[in-house]
Structure formats: structure tokens, C-alpha cells
A protein has these predicted regions:
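Transmembrane alpha-helices and adjacent helix-loop boundaries
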Residues: 1-434
Length: 434
């Protein structure tokens, strides 16, 4: 019996349970946001990864779930009725499911890019109406509330919210995993691969796609409700296109072809955004570059790369991959350093603040501060640094791809099986060339 599918998730949950003991208050809040983003990505992957329905408007159900939770919390706060705080995500999921059925009924009448455009239009409709409907969405300022005590917990400290979020994340992840093994879950895969054949076999593909989409929206609503509980507020920006775009990018970066890949990608990119947004205004540019690089060199995503290595690399094969991957890391560090230096330098000299300094200096190019040092904008040395880093990184990249290709052949045993010494393209990392 293969225990890996049980042991690995159990170890992951155990780590998450013990994590708050080692985190600061700021990192604990970040961990809550990362788990919510991971659940959002898992819910989105049900529609996109399993059923092939690329939605550009999933933020609509994320926001609806959040506002459902907020209105219940407001009602509890006003003592209109009692509703246990740990069960509030059920309301978010219910609202997400209902609107997923209604909106999905219209959207799933079309496929491919037309489906994506319909979902985007419906989300933009809510995004436009939300600031106008003050009673429901609180206009531009949104609605603020407080978490109420339930079941002996106050849900005031962040660690209690962390464990509540963790419980819902684990439960929802298990439900999504189990759904993939139900007849409807198997039908979702068939719809993705060949919808015409499924229709020929007698299935009502429109109804099936609507149900699958609604279930995806259900768990998206749960994620939105958890966000509302953790933030104790919400505004119309929850429906914004940035939330819909983020979950798409995070899913592809994590790897839509694996189950936990999107969750991993969402957690990593949420943490990346939280850290870099405090350091630079160019963090969105870096996030976009990461997406482009992943699509170019790892189109299967981070989860796909891990899965590929777990399947293909033989026992002891990791030894021959250590050196190629170390060279690849050095190459990546050099390229990142060159790109960051260039971007931050350009961002600094093109700002209004720097332009004001030039005006004060009567048009002269004054030195600018970067990484604790002073640089002259017109000095050849200033621009030689990033160019040298990029050139050296580019040279090492060519060497790294060759080393990875050869190491991959040895690690997987393909060199012995193929007399030409070449591995099939689908059996090696995309960045490697034979």
C-alpha cells in the first residue's frame, strides 16, 4: 500500500499546526492570508485545472462570500441573532454556490475564450455596482465589524483566527481532493479533455459544467468568508480585477496540473507580495517577471517540476543533479541582481522626487542612493555593474542548461536507455536542452 498520499499531507498539516509557536505576530497574520489565498487557488483550480474552464471573474464569488460573512458578523454584533463564528464560512460558501449556479448557467453556455469573457463581464458588473449599493457593500469605505466569541473562544488573538483558518483550509482541501474522485469529478476531467465526446455519450454537459463551476464558487466563497473574518472588514475592491488576475497567475506559477501546486504557488506569491511591497514600488513588475519566467522555463509550474522529479529521478540520482542545480542557482542570483539593480536605478531616477533634486541642482544629474550606497547616474561604472551581472548570468545559464540536461539523463537512467543519449522533451525540465 502506497502511504505517500497520506503521510505527506499529514506531515504538512502537522507543520502548519505547530507553526504559530515559531512566528511573530506579523508573520502569523501573513500565514493566515497565505492559507486563504491557497484555498482560493485550490477552488479556482477545480474549474480551470480539472474542468478546463478558465474564469477571469472568480473575484466575484470571493467578494460575495466575504460580504456574506461580514453581514452575519454585523448582525451578531448588533445582537439580531446568534451565529457561531467558526460556522460563518458556511454562509460564504452558500452564497458563492448560489451565485455560481446563476452566473454559471449563463457563462457555461459558451466555451473557451467566450466563457472567460462572460465570467469577466459578470465580475466587472459586480465591481461597478458595489460602490453604488451602499446598504449591501458599504460604498467605497466598505463595512467594518468585529469577530464575536463562540464556543469558548473570543477569536480576538490572531492565533485563534489562524487555527480557525487552518481547520477550514484542511477541510476544504480534503473536500476538493475527494470531489476529484467522484463520478462528477471524473466527468470534469472528461469535459476538459473532450467535451464533444462527453456530449455524444449522452451527458448533459451544460448542467455538468454549471454544477462544477458552482462547486468551485462554493469554496471560493469560503475563502472570501475567511478573509472577512481575519480582516474584520471588506469593501468593493474585493470584486476588483486584480483579485481575479492574481489567482490565475498564482495557479499557473504553482502548476495547475497538480493538486497542491496552485496552493503552493498562491502561498509563495502572497508572501512575496507582502514582503516586496514594503521594500519597493516595483514589486508588481517583479511578480510579472516571475510569471513570464515560469511560463518560459517551467510551463508545468513549481508543482509540476516537483512532481516530475518525484516520478522520474531514480534512487541516488539526486547526487548528479546537485552541481547543475547549484550552477543554476548562482546563475539565477546573478540575473536577479542585475535586473533588480537596473529596475530600481531607473525607478529612482525617473521619480518626481529625483526630478525635484535635479531642478534644485540646476539640471545636473545628482547622485542617487540605492542599497545604502551612492551612485552617479552618468558614470559608466554605475551601468557596468548590472550589465556585467546580466552577461555573466547569461553565460552561466547556457552552461547550467547543458549540465542539467546531462545530469537529468544520468539521474533518470535515460542515458542507458537511449543510445543517442537524449531524453524526450516531456521527460526533462523545460529549461534544459539536450
Amino acid at each position: 500500500m502506497n502511504l505517500r498520499p497520506i503521510i505527506l499531507p499529514a506531515v504538512g498539516v502537522a507543520i502548519l499546526v505547530m507553526l504559530p509557536m515559531f512566528l511573530s505576530a506579523n508573520m502569523l497574520a501573513a500565514s493566515i492570508t497565505m492559507m486563504i489565498a491557497a484555498l482560493f487557488a485550490l477552488a479556482f483550480t477545480l474549474a480551470m485545472g480539472q474542468a478546463g474552464m478558465l474564469s477571469f471573474g472568480h473575484a466575484a464569488y470571493y467578494g460575495l462570500g466575504a460580504f456574506a460573512a461580514i453581514h452575519i458578523m454585523v448582525a451578531v454584533e448588533k445582537k439580531l441573532f446568534f451565529f457561531p463564528t467558526p460556522l460563518i464560512p458556511i454562509a460564504g460558501g452558500a452564497i458563492g454556490f448560489v451565485f455560481g449556479l446563476v452566473f454559471g448557467w449563463f457563462a457555461t453556455q459558451r466555451t473557451s475564450v467566450y466563457f472567460s469573457m462572460v465570467t469577466l463581464a459578470l465580475a466587472e458588473l459586480l465591481y461597478t455596482l458595489a460602490p453604488v449599493w451602499n446598504t449591501v457593500f458599504g460604498a467605497e469605505s466598505g463595512i467594518q465589524t468585529e469577530r464575536g466569541p463562540s464556543w469558548g473562544f473570543t477569536f480576538g488573538p490572531d492565533f485563534e483566527v489562524y487555527y480557525l483558518t487552518l481547520a477550514w483550509f484542511v477541510l476544504s482541501a480534503w473536500c476538493l481532493w475527494a470531489f476529484g474522485r467522484t463520478p462528477l469529478g471524473r466527468l470534469a476531467l472528461a469535459l476538459r479533455d473532450n467535451e464533444h465526446r462527453v456530449r455524444f455519450l449522452g451527458f448533459n454537459t451544460h448542467l455538468a459544467r454549471t454544477l462544477i463551476f458552482a462547486i468551485s464558487c462554493l469554496f471560493t466563497g469560503v475563502a472570501g468568508a475567511l478573509l472577512a473574518i481575519s480582516k474584520e472588514s471588506g469593501n468593493y475592491e474585493l470584486f476588483g480585477p486584480s483579485n481575479s488576475a492574481n489567482v490565475v497567475l498564482q495557479t499557473f506559477i504553482g502548476g495547475a496540473g497538480t493538486f497542491f501546486g496552485p496552493a503552493f504557488g498562491a502561498a509563495v506569491m502572497t508572501f512575496f507580495a507582502r514582503v516586496t511591497s514594503d521594500l519597493t514600488r516595483s514589486w508588481l513588475l517583479y511578480q510579472g517577471l516571475i510569471f513570464v519566467l515560469v511560463m518560459l522555463f517551467m510551463p508545468e509550474g513549481l508543482g509540476g517540476i516537483v512532481s516530475l522529479h518525484a516520478r522520474r529521478v531514480k534512487s541516488g540520482g539526486w547526487k548528479v543533479l546537485v552541481l547543475p542545480y547549484l550552477v543554476c542557482l548562482v546563475c539565477g542570483a546573478l540575473l536577479i541582481a542585475g535586473i533588480v539593480f537596473t529596475v530600481e536605478s531607473l525607478h529612482t531616477v525617473l521619480t518626481d522626487a529625483y526630478n525635484a533634486k535635479r531642478v534644485a541642482a540646476k539640471g545636473a544629474w545628482v547622485p542617487y542612493q540605492l542599497f545604502g550606497r551612492s551612485f552617479e547616474p552618468l558614470s559608466p561604472v554605475t551601468w557596468t555593474i548590472p550589465l556585467a551581472l546580466l552577461a555573466l548570468g547569461g553565460l552561466l545559464l547556457r552552461l547550467a542548461t547543458r549540465l542539467i540536461s546531462r545530469g537529468w539523463l544520468l539521474a533518470t537512467g535515460a542515458a542507458a536507455d537511449d543510445p543517442n543519449g537524449r531524453a524526450a522533451a516531456h521527460d526533462r525540465p523545460q529549461g534544459a536542452t539536450a
